[in-house]
Amino acid sequence: MSQEKERLISGKLVTDDAKLDTSLRPRCLPDFIGQKRLKDNLGVAIQAAKQRGEALDHVLLYGPPGLGKTTLSHIIALEMGVNIRITSGPAIERQGDLAAILTNLKPFDILFIDEIHRLSRNVEEVLYPAMEDYALDIMVGKGPGARSLRLKLPHFTLIGATTRYAMLSAPLRDRFGSIFRLDFYDEEAIHDIVRRSARILGVEADENGLHQIACRSRGTPRVANRLLRRVRDYAQVKGNGLITADIAAESLACLEVDKLGLDEIDHKVLKTIIHKFGGGPVGLETIAAAISEEADTIMDVYEPYLLQLGFLERTPRGRQATRLAYQHLSIPYQNDKNNQQGLWTENGS
């Protein structure tokens, strides 16, 4: 898969997005578009903590990439009026790395750990007393004479973000006071996000042009902002700078993004299941090998949206293309695939 395709439809943050995401990031809950139930519950928790003069309860945010987990963590810090320290699971390799971070926190500070599911179990164990008792247990000495020393930590808030909720251990999950799932955004919310971003970036666009971008954005704000930039470029070079419905449609067609936001790789995944494996069920690892892609990338980037559209089903024997997928790809639907199922299934994937 080319870097351009990855950059366009992936909900994951890439280098080109970082500066733009910061400039477009809302700074308070009322400006955060969508996720109403989450915002309401989070707003109550923040106000209650501020009124009591306490640190906010630990928060876990989970869902597909690009939906606003990092943005929400910054908003929480701004709403609480505290500092935020940002790190990620892969960056914390040893217990000492986490201990150094924890001991440098100030009262009520926020520690944001992205990809928290990638913490090792040894590192995770340091978090248990830190989250529950605001304490850090360290071992002093070695061998039979070693003893445990408990250091007090300031009251702080841990915000964990993950795309793999099921990979978190139960002891870690249980220590979060608030757990919120971010869902894909509906078209109206994405349209509002694209309109807001266009205004901030000074992009000229009519409502029909914005609609063309919104309906292809996979329900993901990060993808919407990325497509807006690419369509802006096309309008500047091929048109008069104004994003109209025709300009947006032409631009996105050139980028091989269809009317539902599916790109070449999405089509390849579905067509591989249909043409090579009789529509499925077929294991994830087999699909990955067939299209020369990593299984984790399919699972994190492509599969959630295909499931959301109802184009893909997860079964005990693997992934299966649905009737809707056949219709979208204009492929005749075959009802009788029993002979194929026995040939191409894998357990558990």
From Swiss-Prot:
User: Which SMART domains does the UniProt record give?
Assistant: AAA (SM00382)
Q: List UniProt keywords, sorted A-Z.
A: ATP-binding, Cytoplasm, DNA damage, DNA recombination, DNA repair, DNA-binding, Hydrolase, Nucleotide-binding
Q: Where is this region: Small ATPAse domain (RuvB-S)?
A: 186-256
What EC number(s) does its UniProt record assign? Answer: 3.6.4.-
What is the top-level taxon of the source organism?
A: Bacteria
The UniProt GO MF terms for this protein read: ATP binding; ATP hydrolysis activity; four-way junction DNA binding; four-way junction helicase activity
Quote the record's binding site residues for ATP.
24-25, 66, 69-71, 132-134, 175, 185, 222
Q: Which parts of this chain are annotated as the region Large ATPase domain (RuvB-L)?
A: 1-185
User: What positions does the entry give for DNA binding?
Assistant: 314, 319
InterPro entries of this UniProt entry? AAA+_ATPase (IPR003593), AAA_lid_4 (IPR041445), DNA_helicase_Holl-junc_RuvB (IPR004605), P-loop_NTPase (IPR027417), RuvB-like_N (IPR008824), RuvB_C (IPR008823), WH-like_DNA-bd_sf (IPR036388), WH_DNA-bd_sf (IPR036390)
Region described as Head domain (RuvB-H): 259-349
What is this enzyme's class at the first EC digit? hydrolase
Coiled-coil annotated spans: none
Kindly list the positions annotated as binding Mg(2+).
70
Assembly and binders: Homohexamer. Forms an RuvA(8)-RuvB(12)-Holliday junction (HJ) complex. HJ DNA is sandwiched between 2 RuvA tetramers; dsDNA enters through RuvA and exits via RuvB. An RuvB hexamer assembles on each DNA strand where it exits the tetramer. Each RuvB hexamer is contacted by two RuvA subunits (via domain III) on 2 adjacent RuvB subunits; this complex drives branch migration. In the full resolvosome a probable DNA-RuvA(4)-RuvB(12)-RuvC(2) complex forms which resolves the HJ.
- Family listed: Belongs to the RuvB family.
Recorded domain comment: Has 3 domains, the large (RuvB-L) and small ATPase (RuvB-S) domains and the C-terminal head (RuvB-H) domain. The head domain binds DNA, while the ATPase domains jointly bind ATP, ADP or are empty depending on the state of the subunit in the translocation cycle. During a single DNA translocation step the structure of each domain remains the same, but their relative positions change.
Query: What this chain does, per the record?
Result: The RuvA-RuvB-RuvC complex processes Holliday junction (HJ) DNA during genetic recombination and DNA repair, while the RuvA-RuvB complex plays an important role in the rescue of blocked DNA replication forks via replication fork reversal (RFR). RuvA specifically binds to HJ cruciform DNA, conferring on it an open structure. The RuvB hexamer acts as an ATP-dependent pump, pulling dsDNA into and through the RuvAB complex. RuvB forms 2 homohexamers on either side of HJ DNA bound by 1 or 2 RuvA tetramers; 4 subunits per hexamer contact DNA at a time.
Q: What is this protein called?
A: Holliday junction branch migration complex subunit RuvB
Chain's gene name: ruvB
